[in-house]
Structures are given as C-alpha cells and as structure tokens.
Amino acid sequence: MPAGSRRRLLKAGIGLAGLSLWSPSALADQNWQTFKRRFVVDDRRVIDSGNNNVSHSESQGWGLLFAQSYDDKETFAKIWEWTSKSLQRGDGLFSWRWSPNTADPVPDKNNAADGDILIAWALARAAAKWNEPRWLAPSRRIQSAILDRLAVDFQGRLILLPGAQGFARGNRYVVNLSYYVWPAIHDFAERAGDQGRWRRLEADGLWLLDNAAFGDYRLPPDWLLFGPQAFRVADDWKPYFGFDAIRVPLYLAWHNQASRLGRFVTAWKTPRFGGRPPAWINLDDGSVAPYPSSGGYAAVAAVTEFMADGGKNAAPVAEITGDDDYYSASLKLLSNLAGQEGPHAKRT
C-alpha cells in the first residue's frame, strides 16, 4: 500500500470560506448535499476525485461519518451496504482501496487502520443516534479486529500499525500518526468491551505524538519509524509534514487536546506562512511546497487555532466550493465537525 498512491497532492490553493451568510445549520446541510452530489456515487461509493475516482476504506469511513453527523440515515445505510459487500474482509477489517478501472477492483487486500477506525466509529455513532442495534454489532466486530490485528505491544508501548501487512522493519515499525483518529479511539476506550487496551492505545499513541517533533517547527512527519535506537522519519517516505500529517492537529482538535495544538499554530503563524499551512514542509531542510495548499488545509488551521484557544466564541465554519476536490472537501467537513464537537469532548 504505497503512501504516495493514496492521494494526489493538490496543486491549486483556495481560500477558506469561513463564516458565511448561511446559518451554521443551513450551511452544514448545504455542505453535505454538495459533498454527496459530487463525491458519493449512487449514494453508495465515495470517490477520491483527485485519484482516478477510486474509493478507499477511508473515504467510505468519512462518508459514513458525514451521513451520520448530518442525519442522513438513508445514505448511511447505502454507504455501509456497499462498503461491507465490496471492501470488508473475512477478519472484519477492510481492504484499503477499490478501483473502478481494473479487472479486479480490489487487487491489494491489505487494510488501512484509519479506514477501519472511521467505519467502526461511524457505525457506533449511528447505532446510538438512531437507536439502531443492527449497526452496533458490526462496529464491535471491527473494533475487536483492530485490537487483534493492528495493536502491537512493542518496547512497553501499544502501537497502532497502519495496516496488517508491510509495516514491520525487522525489530522496528513504521507508524502513521494521522491514522490515530483520537476522538474515535477515546470513544472506544469509554464504551468498548476491551476498554483497557483502547486506553493504552490512546495513551501510548499520544506519547508517540508528543515525542515526534522534528525540524525547526517541531512537527510530526507523515510516516515515523519507531524501534531500538530509532525514532525518526521513516526511510521509505519523504521527510514531510504534509498530506497525511495535516490530519494530526485536526483529530487532536476534535479530541479537545488544546495543550497539544500550540506547536502547529506557532508553525503556521510564522511570517513565512501567514497563518496557512503549506502543502508540505520538509522536516529535514525546512523547504516547503512550491504551490499553495488547499482550502481544506486552511480549514484545519482555523479549527486548530480555535481549539488551541479553548474553543471559545463561534467555531469557524468552512464552505465547500467548486475548487475543492474530495480530499479538500473532506478536510472542510471534518474541520467543521471538530469545531462543533471538540469543545464538548472530554480531555485525556
């Protein structure tokens, strides 16, 4: 599952719409309808428009989460039906990618931990929101499979593997900190059957994140190598805070981790960046992408600053525009949900 093949970097930047003339609830409904019209095929398959219209377990997880959050039960049921039939493996986890243009749409059966977590979380939230027990059992099965297949005891820490295959490097492991969906993991730790292991996964993941501080801006990389005498950017990936790691502060904000957000806000507020994250920062030499980041990045920056300040006043609200592709639009919707739910989340 090469990281570079998961998404295409956006090469055209756009501004954050922010607060608009719409009321927050009306804008939320408009955003969801826009997202669904552009990125949800037949109300079932969520497409990555920046990557040949493939679907990921991640895109399906986000689609489920959005449908649940915006009270669209019919679309939720359709997305889940397609996801379970097209991507779910025998062990309960999900193949990470579905391609519409190949003879076998799922040639790589490996999973992606963030997709698994997002799907399990969306199902649990839907079961509670709509009082639908039919979605709780599959959520619990996925949660158990995540702990069984992806949670590894290593050097006194319980770490989350990005996928079941391909991330061991001898006596070291490659970790992707953006795959830790903190509000979901915390919810599992509060409600799941194996609360102790979820709590360990949360606490040890936050320890990894706190120590993953590289370069002049002390930021986490997209991919981290962890092991004996090894705590560094993973060798097989570029030393970037970029397309993956931008989700780290987003999920921290959603989890109400104000004390952990300061380094991101400080980095983005340097005169060089003017408050907006670059598309990527090279953590080795400080160079940045020669093209601007998307409006989704700006939405993440806005909610990060909002939650770093304690979630006071009105949360920023980003509007999906015609310039947003799937990933940028998703970051906007996720940031809006983080701003809505983050101030009420329990701190760890």
Language-model segments: residues:
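N-terminal export signals
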Residues: 1-2, 8-28
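Extended ligand-binding clefts on enzyme/binding-domain cores
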Residues: 30, 53-58, 114, 136-312, ...
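N-terminal carbohydrate-binding/catalytic regions of secreted carbohydrate-active enzymes
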Residues: 32-113
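Short glycine/serine- and small hydrophobic-enriched flexible loop segments
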Residues: 64-69, 118-128, 183-187, 250-254, ...
